[in-house]
C-alpha cells in the first residue's frame, strides 16, 4: 500500500515538474538554464498523442505530418497557427533552439539530430516550408507536363474505298475518250483515200444505172 502511494506521489510530482518547465518555456521567464534537466522538456505533438523534445518534435512533424502541418495548435505557446508548424516554431521560438545549441547536452545528441538542429538554426526566418509546398505543384507541372492528346486515326470504310476506285476508273476512261487521236501515217492516209474513191465510184455507178433503167 505504501509503495502504491509513493508511486502515485512520484508520478504527480514528475507531471507537476513537466508542467512547470513547460510554463517557463511559454512565458519566456527561463532565460538561462542551470541544469541539463531543464532542457529535457517534452512537448506533445499537435497532430498525434506522442511526446518529443522540441528538436525531435520538429523532425517528427517534418517526417510524419507534412501534409497536416499547415494548421494546428503550437505546443509551445498554445496558439493556433495557420502556417507550417515547424516554420512557426523556428521563427517564434528560435531562442529555444539557440539555447539547445549552446548547452552542453548538445554533444549528447546523435549526429543526425545535431545536423537537423543546425539546419533549423541556420534556416532563414522566412517560411521555408510554406514556399516549398507552393513550389512543389509548379515543379511537378514543369517536370511532368501533361501528355498531348493523341488524335484518333479514322479507318476508311471498305465501301468508301470501292466507290473511290470506281470513280477513278470512270475518270480515267473518260479522259482517254476525250484524248485527240494520234496522227495517221502516209500509208494509212493513202488507203483511206482509196476506200473513199471506191465508195464514191459505187455510189455513182448505182445512180447511173438507176437513171438508165428509168
UniProtKB/Swiss-Prot annotation:
Compartments where found: Nucleus
Organ and tissue specificity: Expressed in seedlings, roots, leaves, stems, flowers and siliques.
Maturation and modification: Phosphorylated in vitro by CPK3 or CPK11.
Modified residues (Phosphoserine): 110
Compositional bias segments (type: Basic and acidic residues): 168-179
Polar residues compositional bias, start-end: 156-166
Coiled coil: none
Induction statement: Not induced by abscisic acid.
Protein name: Protein DEHYDRATION-INDUCED 19 homolog 5
